[in-house]
């Protein structure tokens, strides 16, 4: 299985390292607002060489809200980013109120919340009359 863990803090990174299964293919995306990120990456590569680590700038997802009105360069980046994440079996994030969480929600990329993720985009789904009828019929 292919997993990706998206970390914004040292705590997220620690939990990701605890949670990951060494037998799986694992990527960790670390955002640049983590303190001493270079030293941390060096240590992870030393002790877990099979884990791929990528650094992303925290503000990169805020610039691109919709594909429709973007330049070809931005559209290409968005397409590559969406395809990158769709290649994973599991995407793990800690809070979906972050820019990357909004990105996943906007482009309908399925993700898993770890720990006490806010589940910012959850909502109560109202039942239509037909689905209510089918639900009652099952009983």
Q: Could you describe each region identified by the protein language model?
A:
Residues 4-138:
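Active-site and donor-binding regions of nucleotide-sugar-utilizing enzymes
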């Amino acid at each position: 299985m292919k997993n990706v863990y998206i970390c914004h803090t040292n705590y997220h990174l620690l939990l990701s390292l605890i949670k990951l299964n060494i037998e799986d293919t694992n990527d960790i995306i670390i955002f640049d607002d983590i303190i001493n990120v270079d030293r941390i990456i060096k240590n992870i590569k030393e002790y877990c060489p099979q884990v791929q680590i990528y650094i992303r700038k925290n503000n990169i997802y805020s610039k691109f809200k919709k594909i429709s009105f973007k330049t070809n360069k931005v559209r290409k980046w968005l397409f590559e980013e969406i395809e990158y994440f769709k290649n994973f079996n599991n995407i793990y994030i800690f809070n979906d109120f972050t820019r990357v969480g909004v990105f996943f929600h906007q482009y309908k990329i399925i993700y898993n919340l770890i720990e006490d993720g806010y589940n910012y985009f959850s909502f109560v789904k109202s039942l239509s009359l037909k689905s209510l009828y089918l639900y009652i019929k099952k009983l």
